[in-house]
Design a protein with these regions (language model features):
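A conserved beta-strand-loop-helix scaffold within acyl/acetyltransferase catalytic domains
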Residues: 5-64, 109-115, 132-143, 149, ...
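Aromatic-rich peripheral "rim/lid" segments of glycoside hydrolase catalytic domains that contact
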Residues: 393, 400, 407, 416-417, ...
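Conserved catalytic-core motifs of GNAT/GCN5-like acyltransferases
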Residues: 134-143, 401-413
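Short, basic, helix/turn surface patches
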Residues: 165-170, 218-222, 400, 429-440
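Acyl-donor binding region in acyl/amide transferases
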Residues: 64-145, 309-312, 318-397
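Short linear capping/connector segments at secondary-structure termini
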Residues: 108, 187, 365-367, 408-412
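Membrane-proximal basic amphipathic "stem/tether" segments
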Residues: 266-285, 414-440
Length: 440
């Protein structure tokens, strides 16, 4: 027998999340980010022991009424069917008292990992549907999260992996792309909320990165105020990394390469055959790098006369053992020449390792709505065409592709809920269209 109540001790609520694999979207700081939602905190107890915690956000909509949503679901032992049953009964009563149209949650329970079925995911689908939840089969209508994420494990057993050891699992091309960043004039800075407050140009640079990225990959980026709010509310658990192309540094590196070539040319005059071949390789390598350098400088000069250009950036949150890459991208300048996206993501991975995280979360990709399987679960979740490249990039870092069980709805008022379900796609499209028109 379990008891449930509205939780007012948010410190205890957050402590439970941190100790039991909760996510930043489930903690009390999230209400200060999602200010258009009304937040209520619930906890479940077995005697005096806290065994469940859930942040329920409420939004009132015309026609649809009150929509309740728990991002990431409840933090609890999902294999405990009795706990889930009693929690569901409790939520049904709360919905009646609050006049809620529905309660939506999307538990981070994997249905497939790298394409392999997970029995626990199929069992969870059956448990939830037996308890009265309905699976939302239309991915494009999901409330907030896509039902996929790409994770890089940072531990093997009790041993933390180094960033270099993780990279050994990646393709050779990934390791090469990371290495050449610093060799071609890239430098990075890590900023906090305080830094952004003192120097607004930092956020302006990041927004320029995100605008280029969103236009290139056909999505709508968050604005600077929202990103600043995330840094503020997760102060001490967040950072903003910006990667710059520094022309002065690149010029210095090129001068060093040319000196190396001159030395090789001088030694060639007296070198024996084997040594001469090695020197020839050095000279050819410098010539090739010089060609890249000249293209880089020409492209950068055409883009701006500034000596330092922000070419990439990423905002991350580190919470409860997970380093989450929320937003990130690159400018449309010297992207391929410097491999700035690889360099940025390597730095973000290093930060997660440095902070002792167990998982590095590369985030989600937008997926297509699948056919349902025979047991009623979601079929294979395939990235939309404009996100295929992003998916391939994230997978190249040896990330595991988790397909979650999806979004489940407990319906309180059928008429209002199905009106909401019918109107939501139209409302989402109208919102995106309006944002794009305003930005043009």
């Amino acid at each position: 027998m379990y008891t449930f109540k509205v939780e007012t001790d948010l410190k205890a609520f957050d402590s439970f999340l941190e100790e039991n694999g909760g996510q930043y979207i489930q903690c009390s700081a999230w209400q200060n980010v999602k200010t258009t939602w009304k937040c209520t905190y619930y906890c479940g107890f077995e005697g005096e022991k806290r065994v469940l915690a859930v942040l329920v956000m409420e939004r009132s909509l015309p026609v649809a009424g009150k929509i309740w949503y728990a991002s990431g679901g409840a933090v609890c032992d999902y294999s405990n069917t009795e706990l889930l049953r009693e929690f569901t009964d409790f939520m049904k009563e709360e919905m009646k008292k609050g006049g809620a149209t529905c309660f939506i949650m999307d538990p981070s329970v994997s249905l497939r990992i790298n394409g392999e079925d997970q029995a626990s995911g199929h069992e969870m689908h059956k448990t939830l549907t037996d308890l009265g939840y309905e699976l939302n089969p239309s991915i494009e209508n999901y409330t907030y999260k896509q039902p996929v994420q790409l994770f890089i494990p940072l531990f093997e057993g009790d041993t933390q992996l180094t960033a270099d050891k993780i990279l050994k699992k990646c393709d050779k091309g990934v390791r090469y792309s990371i290495r050449i960043g610093e060799q071609r004039g890239l430098v990075a800075e890590s900023y906090t909320y305080e830094d952004v407050e003192k120097n607004p140009q930092i956020m302006d640079d990041f927004m320029a990165v995100m605008r280029d990225t969103s236009e290139r990959d056909s999505f709508v980026e968050r604005n600077g105020d929202y990103c600043t709010k995330l840094l503020r509310e997760f102060m001490g658990h967040s950072d903003l990394k910006l990667v710059y192309y520094d022309k002065d540094i690149d010029e210095k590196l090129q001068a060093e390469r040319l000196q190396k070539k001159e030395k090789a040319l001088a030694e060639m005059k007296t070198a024996h055959e084997k040594k001469a071949r090695q020197l020839k390789e050095t000279i050819d390598s410098v010539d090739k790098q010089t060609e890249h350098y000249e293209k880089r400088m020409a492209e950068a000069e055409e883009f701006t006369k500034d000596r330092r250009i922000c070419v990439a950036g990423g905002l991350s949150i580190y919470y409860a053992g997970m380093g989450s890459c929320l937003f990130g991208g690159t400018r449309n300048v010297i992207r391929n020449n410097t491999r700035s996206s690889h360099y940025l993501n390597y730095l973000r991975l290093c930060e997660s390792v440095k902070r002792g995280c167990k998982i590095h979360d590369l985030g989600y990709v937008i997926v297509k709505t699948p056919e349902l399987q025979e047991d009623g679960t979601l079929g294979e979740l395939i990235p939309q065409d404009n996100f295929k490249g992003i998916y391939d990039f994230k997978k190249s870092f040896s990330a595991d592709y988790h397909e979650f069980i999806g979004e489940y709805i407990l319906v309180g008022n059928s008429l209002k809920y199905y009106s909401y379900a019918k109107l939501m796609p139209t409302a989402k499209k109208a919102k995106i269209k309006a944002i794009k028109m305003l930005r043009r």
